[in-house]
Curated annotation (Swiss-Prot):
<feature type="signal peptide">
    <location>
        <begin position="1"/>
        <end position="23"/>
    </location>
</feature>
<keyword id="KW-0732">Signal</keyword>
<comment type="function">
    <text>Specific inhibitor of cysteine proteinases. Probably involved in the regulation of endogenous processes and in defense against pests and pathogens.</text>
</comment>
<dbReference type="Pfam" id="PF16845">
    <property type="entry name" value="SQAPI"/>
</dbReference>
<dbReference type="InterPro" id="IPR000010">
    <property type="entry name" value="Cystatin_dom"/>
</dbReference>
<keyword id="KW-0964">Secreted</keyword>
<dbReference type="GO" id="GO:0005576">
    <property type="term" value="C:extracellular region"/>
</dbReference>
<keyword id="KW-0646">Protease inhibitor</keyword>
<dbReference type="GO" id="GO:0006952">
    <property type="term" value="P:defense response"/>
</dbReference>
<dbReference type="InterPro" id="IPR027214">
    <property type="entry name" value="Cystatin"/>
</dbReference>
<dbReference type="GO" id="GO:0004869">
    <property type="term" value="F:cysteine-type endopeptidase inhibitor activity"/>
</dbReference>
<comment type="similarity">
    <text>Belongs to the cystatin family. Phytocystatin subfamily.</text>
</comment>
<keyword id="KW-0789">Thiol protease inhibitor</keyword>
<keyword id="KW-0611">Plant defense</keyword>
<protein>
    <recommendedName>
        <fullName>Putative cysteine proteinase inhibitor 9</fullName>
    </recommendedName>
</protein>
<dbReference type="InterPro" id="IPR046350">
    <property type="entry name" value="Cystatin_sf"/>
</dbReference>
């Protein structure tokens, strides 16, 4: 009984890992970072983030990379961007994930990267 439980547990773990990998980064598609809509989404994300107020305001400099995922009628954008701060005299790099459904946007994450 104990051996069959371990085999079942291992099978479930492998299946779960396979499902996670299938739904992971492979579903993101690279898109044109210079596309006007991508630029608009990036501008919105920079204005929306708490980092903007914490650093005295952020200004979008460039979108260095852009990926898109379409899931259940919703667009998700994963953007690698560079912004500058009026207070911190240097360029900062961030990864932003934005949810877009119709005209509605939500900032899923906005994290600094190196």
């Amino acid at each position: 009984m104990r051996t069959s439980s371990l085999v079942l547990f291992a099978a479930v773990a492998v299946f779960g890992a396979a499902c996670t990998a299938a739904a992971g980064d492979e579903s993101w598609k690279t898109i044109d970072a210079n596309d006007r809509h991508v630029q608009d989404v990036a501008l919105w994300a920079v204005a929306e983030t708490d980092w903007a107020s914490a650093t005295g305001g952020l200004t979008l400099n460039t979108v260095d990379g852009a990926e898109k995922r379409f899931e259940a009628g919703v667009n998700y954008y994963r953007l690698t961007l560079e912004a500058s701060s009026r207070v911190v005299a240097k360029y900062l790099r961030f990864q932003a994930v934005v949810y877009e459904e119709g005209d509605e946007h939500k900032l899923v994450s906005f994290v600094p990267i190196h």
